Regions:
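Acidic/histidine-rich catalytic neighborhood
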Residues: 134, 154-155, 178
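Short helix immediately C-terminal to the catalytic nucleophile in hydrolase catalytic domains
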Residues: 157-161
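Alpha/beta-hydrolase active-site loop
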Residues: 116-140
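Gly/Ala-rich beta-loop-alpha elbow adjacent to hydrolase catalytic centers
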Residues: 149-153
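Active-site nucleophile loop of the alpha/beta-hydrolase fold
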Residues: 175-181
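Short, surface-exposed "cap/lid" segments of acyl-processing enzymes
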Residues: 13, 17-113
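Secondary-structure transition/capping motifs at alpha-helix termini
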Residues: 64-67, 96-104, 135-144, 163-174
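Extended, charge-enriched "interface" segments that sit outside catalytic cores
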Residues: 1-4, 8
């Protein structure tokens, strides 16, 4: 079907693998071209709508006119980048949610520095979870949101939910956890 192009491409790849291995076959297992944000990784269009010394909050707007009123706020782990759920267009959870009509917000945890290195768990709850909830509701004009907690982001979110329940704060209407303890 390719008129021999696939065979030639395979020979070129084998030649390049032998070059990388200094005469021995070094089989390339991944695309080694550099990742570029917005080009070949994290391609869902979003914008920062809030920032403080701990987080940046990124808003992704659905492409269509039909959208759900209640936004979705995602708390990924701080050991991953904000785009952990938007690695490739073909299997981006962010894009899938947008295509379903959801307005999506994702917390991007800033790297620890001299300002944040002594922050406690409570600081992460207040400056992370509470700040993101408030900013999401302000950006959308809604009174409630749905949330997702992923890994340690989910553990943090569950701590915040316990405090919110004890104080009568019901702004988070539903929660889903991924790989959280």
């Amino acid at each position: 079907e390719s008129g021999g192009e696939s065979v030639l491409a395979g020979i070129r790849m084998a030649r390049d693998d032998v070059k990388k291995g200094n005469g021995k076959l070094y089989i390339t297992q991944t695309d080694e071209t550099p990742f570029k944000l917005g080009k070949n990784i994290a391609t869902a269009p979003g914008e920062v709508v809030f920032r403080n010394d701990l987080i940046e909050l990124i808003q992704y707007k659905p492409p269509g006119e039909q959208t759900y009123a209640r936004p979705l706020l995602i708390f990924p782990p701080w050991i991953n980048k904000f785009y952990i759920l938007d690695l490739r267009e073909e299997n981006s959870m962010i894009r899938w949610l947008l295509d379903k009509g959801l307005s999506v917000f994702v917390v991007s945890w800033r790297s620890a520095d001299e300002v944040t290195c002594d922050y406690t768990w409570n600081d992460y709850v207040k400056k992370g979870v509470y700040a993101a909830v408030e900013a999401t509701l302000q950006a959308t004009g809604q009174k409630g949101l749905n949330a997702v907690g992923y890994c340690i982001g989910g553990t943090l979110l569950s701590s915040a939910l316990g405090h919110m329940a004890a104080t009568g704060d019901d702004r988070i209407k539903s929660v889903t956890f991924f790989a959280s303890q």
